[in-house]
Amino acid sequence: MKIGSIGYNHVHDMKYENFIMDRPKGPGAVLLLLIKTPSVFRVGGVQYQVKENSFILMSADTPCYYTAQEDVYTDDWVYFENGYWDKEYVEKLGIPMDIPVYLGDIDELSHLVHILVYEHYSGAVNSEEIEKKYIDVLFLMPVSY
């Protein structure tokens, strides 16, 4: 699997912006979100009240909508390149697609995303290989919760 773009600890304060992510045709690529604040999600026509410290792995073409449930929406996000997405690997691990999952504690996962942000944008020697290893860890961690 390969990262297309990635972001760490993005905060949207609803006092200053009306943050709504509305993608009726889906996000365009597989999207992993680590959700850090209570949120409202509608994925594939099903609405969810999502607790903080949850994650969701959304399919590229599943319609989705999400926003803050309160004053702030915060998440880490990872878009995966479509040509490199390994659906069989994720299915083998038993990670659900298009359904929010409450983990209780996402600090380690969020820290890993922070490291991945650096690796992805650094262009350092071997960063692509290092990134691949961290992606494996990223998908193995939720399975261990």
Put a short name on every predicted segment.
Residues M1-K51, E70:
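Generic protein-terminus/edge-of-domain signal
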Residues L31, E108, I130:
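Amphipathic alpha-helical recognition patches that constitute DNA-binding helices
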